[in-house]
Amino acid sequence: MFEELLPLACRWVEEQERGILRDGLPLDPEQLEIARKVGIRELGRIRLLEVHEVPEPEDPLLQAAAEAAGLISLLTSGLTARYGIFIRSDYWGNRQLLAHELAHVAQYERLGGIEPFLRRYLTECLNAGYPNGELEQEAKAVEKRFA
């Protein structure tokens, strides 16, 4: 089942990233400083997109899996699609959330892109449960540095 879902998840993330890179805003100087401290290499590629709700996958199988794992819900405040970051409107300007999502950007870079990141992140979520995976805990630790 995982090997069926992974390509769907990769395509969905690629589509989301394209939209965010097209419509999103570049980081401002304060946000760039946070990104530098988080260790992102490609600072100029990052875009933020303010949304009323973080979108869910349209594919029914992928949507059901994301909801069952607790990865995306109406309560999701942010989501990173490699260099594109969705930020829910009521969290716009929240430094901690931004730092958390930027930590995921750094993880995408470190792990080598969308497929390697999703393979590891989703495997951790399935094995340890969300939000107990190593990558998510790393992002939570980064978030705390910017409280």
Identify the meaning behind each predicted range.
Residues M1-G44, E50-E56, L61-T80, F86-W92, ...:
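Metalloprotease/metallohydrolase-associated module, dominated by Zn2+-dependent proteases
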Residues Y91-Q107:
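Short alpha-helix carrying the canonical HExxH Zn2+-binding catalytic motif
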